[in-house]
């Protein structure tokens, strides 16, 4: 399964570009042109926080109960976006920046019981 991410700053840059350039195309898929597997994504997340990844594969539980992505590729053709805006923030860089923001703003983040649900049911 491959996933495709897009940094919010890139989304804002792209919207600004659409508003200022008025391209002929009106419909765009947006995203990072490089997709990653779930394992690659997990490794990048752990790298961003400076931790070692220990992968545990869960057997006997439907994946959809604890993991927000279904078992198919989430990959869009972003050729039209890339033609207008060829440079996007690499996923690893965006993850590191997001983690640093979280560390500096931990008290402002609204916590949800999602992790507790996973702990209680797996």
Task: Write out the residue ranges for each language-model feature.
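C-terminal substrate-binding subdomain of Rossmann-fold SDR/epimerase-dehydratase oxidoreductases
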Residues: 1-122
């Amino acid at each position: 399964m491959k996933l495709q991410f897009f940094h919010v700053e890139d989304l804002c840059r792209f919207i600004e570009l659409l508003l200022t350039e008025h391209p002929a195309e009106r419909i765009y898929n947006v995203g990072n042109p490089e997709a990653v597997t779930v394992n690659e994504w997990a490794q990048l997340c752990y790298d961003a926080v400076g931790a070692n990844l220990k992968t545990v594969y869960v057997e006997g539980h439907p994946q959809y109960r604890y993991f927000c992505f279904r078992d198919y590729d989430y990959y869009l053709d972003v050729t039209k976006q890339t033609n207008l805006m060829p440079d996007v923030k690499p996923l690893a860089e965006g993850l590191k920046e997001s983690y640093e923001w979280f560390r500096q703003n931990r008290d402002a983040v609204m916590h949800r019981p999602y992790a507790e649900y996973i702990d209680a049911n797996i």
